[in-house]
Amino acid sequence: MSFKNPVLGLCQQAAFMLSAARVDQCPADDGLEVAFAGRSNAGKSSALNTLTHANLARTSKTPGRTQLLNFFRLDDRRRLVDLPGYGYAKVPIPLKQHWQHHLEAYLGSRRSLAGVVLLMDIRHPLTDFDRMMLDWAGASGMPMHILLTKADKLAFGAAKNALLKVRREIHKGWGEGMSVQLFSAPKRQGVEEAHDVLARWLGLAGDDGGEADAGA
């Protein structure tokens, strides 16, 4: 793991760019961007806020802006993207289908997408949505890093066992190319490890003289 991650400074200056309801409303498809995906209430907004040291993403349990693709600028060539939360129980089925359509359009067409961070609640990992995302990443060759969020909700031993179980299942079903780690926003657990992955995907891993550790 790097001693001083070059992505940290960029994350600390992250700023909201725009929200897009459709792919044609997204920023110009150049540079590099990393997308954050996960079921509603998997802790995606809290993770983004923790990684950027800012209150970028709304943490309300109501859908709100989660129906949009929200872009955050790191610098002129790098962005983070908060993808629509999936599976919110109170959202009408037609709206869910609308979200899914535009999520698939974004994932299938975005050339600047360098990797996807998939967030899973450690107490309920590998849902149908998670498996769908893993299938897509495996088929497309897209780098994917999994954050097992809310790790503080389990005892240390139970969290480690959950990590090993999920890692084994992912490597068995989708290959060795996907990395998995524990993450807790309130405890700031796993922040440096996640920053190392972002640094590599955003072309910053060599800036401090060392290769980032993906935590696989």
Swiss-Prot record:
Q: Which GO terms describe its cellular component?
A: cytosol
The record, for Gene3D superfamilies, names: P-loop containing nucleotide triphosphate hydrolases
Xref: InterPro entries: G_ENGB_dom, GTP-bd, GTP-bd_ribosome_bio_YsxC, P-loop_NTPase
Question: Which Pfam families does its entry note?
Answer: MMR_HSR1 (PF01926)
Key words, A-Z: Cell cycle, Cell division, GTP-binding, Magnesium, Metal-binding, Nucleotide-binding, Septation
Tell me its cofactors: Mg(2+)
Residues the record lists as binding GTP:
38-45, 64-68, 82-85, 149-152, 182-185
Q: Which PANTHER family match?
A: ENGB-TYPE G DOMAIN-CONTAINING PROTEIN, MSS1/TRME-RELATED GTP-BINDING PROTEIN
Q: Tell me the protein family, please.
A: Belongs to the TRAFAC class TrmE-Era-EngA-EngB-Septin-like GTPase superfamily. EngB GTPase family.
What's the protein name?
Probable GTP-binding protein EngB
Starting at the broadest rank, the lineage of the source organism is:
Bacteria, Pseudomonadati, Pseudomonadota, Gammaproteobacteria, Pseudomonadales
